[in-house]
Amino acid sequence: MESTRVFVSGLPPTLTNDQLKKHFETRFHVTDAHVLPKRRIGFVGFKSSEAAQQAVSYFNKTYMRMSKISVDIAKPIDAEPAHRKDSRTAQPDDALGNNLKRKRDGDTIKDSKTQEYLSLLQQPSKTRTWANDDQLPDPDETDSHAQEQEQPFDVDDQEELTYAQRKKAKLGQDANESSHVPVVAGYQPTTDESDGQPSPEKHEEELEDPQKDQAPVSDSDWLRSKTSRLLGLLDEDEQETFASPAAATNPTPIINSNVEKPEAESPEKPAESDLTKAPTAAEVDTNIENIRISARLFVRNLSYETKESELEPVFSPFGKIEEIHVAFDTRFTTSKGFAYVQYADPDAAVEAYRNLDGKIFQGRLLHILPASQKKTYKLDEHELSKLPLKKQKQIKRKQEAASSTFSWNSLYMNADAVMSSVAERIGVSKADLLDPTSSDAAVKQAHAETHVIQETKAYFKANGVNLDAFKQRERGNLAILVKNFSYGTKTEDLRKLFEPFGQITRLLMPPSGTIAIVAFARPDEAQKAFKSLAYRKLGDSILFLEKAPKDLFEADVPPQNPLPETKAVSQGFSTADTFAADEGDEEVMATATLFIKNLNFSTTNQSLIEAFRPLDGFVSARIKTKPDPKNPGQTLSMGFGFADFKTKAQAQAALAVMNGYTLDRHTLVVRASHKGMDAAEERRKEDTAKKIAARRTKIIIKNLPFQATKKDVRSLFGAYGQLRSVRVPKKFDRSARGFGFADFVSAREAENAMDALKNTHLLGRRLVLEFANEEAIDAEEEIQRIEKKVGEQLDRVKLQKLTGAGRKKFTVGAQDDES
């Protein structure tokens, strides 16, 4: 995951979060801004990583209030810091070396024999003869070597140590210094008479002045003790809280060397961070256990513009997600900055928690906590059993509306509304349209529904609806398909019904008035409307609601006013339309290569390319060559070549220009290139083309009503092309088996019938149409198919012999009876 957060240093001292955000918002959209004023650094979050990169390029080394700022991509929290040794670390090394050198010079001067030698070299008038008697051994000489051995860490090394290591070294140094203090004769520690422990009064006095009996420290140690290590990261109150445990744990000075030394801190104890205290293992285990119970995550510190669709790619790689809910503020129509993610598998939720907690998302650091289980309002089965059975089914169906899958297709329409719409359009009554004495009333209704569906598709496509989205099973969370309402329902009626639940962004109803699409601004509003209005009675019908497919709208196309004269796509096809597809295939298969002959034998590939390069669509050119028998390794031109172009039209234009062109004193002859084939190959190609054209002419009709006859199928499919044959298989009792076949003359007619009738209902059943299995184009493919079928049959026979061998009947003791 690329970082969407930038690090800004060198900020003005009095800069605030709002001012930093306002400065970066002059060019980019900012999701978060945080300033640490004491350190003059800050962090700025952006919506995408591209915006963060552009912000670094634009704002780096610019000025804010006379302060030059540096902008760089922020590193993750768990990134390891680069170990480098700067000049500040190198300077103490040199200083320490110089100090050691000066100490050696001083020691040399303090040496007794050296002083005696130097005194002899001085003039007699400057020599004090009485000074030799008063010289005493310097106590520093006896302790200098011991102090050098007892020093565990150098001054410059302590800057690279952690807080725990420096504290441990200090404790060891104090203990070593106390061990060299001479024992005072007659000294006894003050103890309490009751239990023999040291007196608390004396202990308190020692704690009040811990530095009283310690030896004087060096200048660097004194300066380090007066300098805060927090560098302004914490407030004053936090600094006092942070420093109080350290003051309480200071060791008391030890006077007698026989007294036991205080133990240093255990190295196994983890050091506390200067900024934040890491959660303990018990807390982490508690969070994980809570997540395993609910499989639900509470995600906070989100941007106020975050949507469910943006969170799904982040959390979906860890497992199947049942629901993502972003909390919205109804007063300001913006997000509250937190969301809930419900997983189907608890292990997936735990994995997401471990990998995403503290990560950067849209410029903010994610904070993930375990969430409680979602509240569900279950029905009381005891109270529900007291109601009538019909009422029980209605309540259960309404309760399960949000999670149930519908058996009808997305473009399902009320049959009565379809017939009413068609009857009103042609100016007849519905009774005249459906003649009770006619046997093809079901076919008429199917034709009417097909006409209305085609009209609805044309209207939706004109208003920016992606019709291919209806083929996918994944559903969105913003749009709702409203179906099964009575004919005559107006757009205003649906708007009044859905508006109380939220802001409606789109409301589309085709001229037929049999289906509608309602789109909301927020997912929670759409969910609330779906739960409240599912199976509600509207007029003399019941509303059927279905969640619209995902990515239903292609673009933000404004809805067009429905025109009364809007017509459906014409279903009539002429002979030219029928064979248009074949002509298009020939156009695609046509060559875009030119054959060039009468070339000069001295013409090279480079000269031929230079001649054809200025032409539009030129790709390459080459001269056909052969090996030179007299000069091995060399080639000879054969006097012709080829030139390739991108399209056939460009090749035709080049042919008209270059035919008759003079190149190297030779007039070029340019023709369209054709691959040479023998008679058998040409015949094979023709047969293959015929089989390809005829392989998609047969349609298998599934979910066919048992009452449908062969005549009904012919009447329904015959309106879209000329049928070669219609077959409806029957059982032994002459009843239909529920499927049929329709074979068209051309593949274009079969495709048109498939596209028009794939959402049509016949006698209340939706027709499921598929192309029948294609016949083998090549004889080799047919042979392989037959061999595979025979092999499967032989395997079944062998399996039957193996499993049936142990089922033979046998008589126990038959031989004994015969004897």
Swiss-Prot record:
Domain of life: Eukaryota
An individual GO BP term: small-subunit processome assembly
Domain RRM residues, every copy: 4-76, 295-373, 478-550, 592-675, 697-774
Annotated GO CC locations: 90S preribosome; cytoplasm; nucleolus; nucleus; ribonucleoprotein complex; small-subunit processome
SMART domains: RRM, RRM_1
Protein family per UniProt: Belongs to the RRM MRD1 family.
Protein name: Multiple RNA-binding domain-containing protein 1
Coiled-coil spans in chain: none
Entry keyword annotation includes Nucleus: yes
Subcellular location: Nucleus
InterPro entries according to UniProt: Mrd1_RRM3, Nucleotide-bd_a/b_plait_sf, RBD_domain_sf, RRM_dom, RRM_dom_euk
CDD domains: RRM1_MRD1, RRM3_MRD1, RRM4_MRD1, RRM5_MRD1
Alphabetized GO MF terms: mRNA binding; rRNA primary transcript binding
Region (Disordered): 80-223, 242-281
Keywords, ordered alphabetically: Nucleus, Repeat, Ribonucleoprotein, RNA-binding, rRNA processing
Main location: nucleus
Job description of the protein: Involved in pre-rRNA processing.
Ranges of Polar residues composition bias in the record: 115-132, 247-259
Biased composition, class Acidic residues, residue ranges: 151-160
Keyword Transport: no
Organism listed in the record: Emericella nidulans (strain FGSC A4 / ATCC 38163 / CBS 112.46 / NRRL 194 / M139)
Compositional bias annotation for Basic and acidic residues: 104-114, 200-212, 260-275
Pfam family, one: RRM_1
